[in-house]
Amino acid sequence: MNKPFIIDAHLDLSMNALEWNRDLRQPLKEINRREIGMTDKPDRGNATISFEELRKGNVGLVVATQIGRYVGPDNPLPGWHSPEQAWAQTQGQLAWYKAMEEEGQMVMIRDKKALETHLALWKDSEPADKKPIGYVLSIEGADSFITVNHVERAYAYGLRAVGPAHYGPGRYANGTDSTGHLNAMGKELLRTMDRLGMILDVTHLCDEAFWDALDLYKGPIWASHNNCRAFVDHNRQFSDEMIKALIERGAVIGIALDAWMMVPNWVRGESTPRGMNCGMEIMANNIDHVCQLAGNANHVAIGSDLDGAFGTEQCPYDLVTIADLQKIFPILQYRGFTDDAINRIASGNWIEFLRKHLPE
């Protein structure tokens, strides 16, 4: 089959640019060469993403993040010591996206018209190396909204999706490895997002906050990068009950490629993808599991999270660059997935969702 057009619903591109100091305009080999000998991050020299590799893989549209965590005095996680600092970080990330737009490397997809224009551009026969990567702007964790009113400011500059939580306790909602119901600020955040017509990303919400959010939120919901608890029994993944509830809400779930979410008993810094037999077949297992629960292929897609503070040391052994996302489709074809189902998983489900829920 031809290379399907891919939408990847979770890439921390600005984090890579500004915290990892990676110039994504450079070839991937050069990005990794400049990190030889560096030890400040666990994934130095193991990057999988550059603009060139996105184009090679026919990944023409992504959901790209802002991220800035606030941590209180008793929170051991890395993060900023005030929401104002976290907000400033996200604004620096926005400035990088704007700089990439001015360079012609990226284009923001704010509304339905921009979406259709961009999809038409990637359908034409011009070589992909001349085409900008489209991005829908999302935020991973809402800590950086100094007040709930800041979400309105963010919507005005193009933010279209919000994940209220990340790891640990958050100002608006508690996330992975944490517990607790949505607080008053979190509920107010959801009401504001609802009024603006924003997309709620339920990825990383702890179980109690997940169910609170589904009850409270009336607008569009997706899970940009989340796998199945049936395979890795950890609160970071969704139980079958959660997946079924999302299917009922018309959500799409993006399957992620962080190895610890793919195989049980992964030990960070010790386990290896080959040693744990973590390959793209595991991604196919997660895709198939959601399809079995849904009875169709309409609610699952790709949200790789590649280079999300991990690289080739902690992703499928048969993926060296993001262009290797294309390897999932022959695996699905071999398992009996139709071309229509494969195209839905590659991008069709995200396209349908965005056509329905982006503003006019």
Each language-model region and where it sits:
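Short, catalytically relevant binding-site loops at active-site mouths
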Residues: 207-208, 228-230, 259-262
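Loop-centered beta-sheet repeat module
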Residues: 179-215, 220-225
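N-terminal hydrophobic targeting/anchoring segments and the immediately downstream early-domain regions
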Residues: 1-179, 184, 233-360
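Histidine-centered catalytic micro-motifs
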Residues: 6-13, 205, 223-226
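Short acidic (Asp/Glu) and glycine-rich catalytic loops that position anionic groups and cofactors
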Residues: 222, 227, 306-309
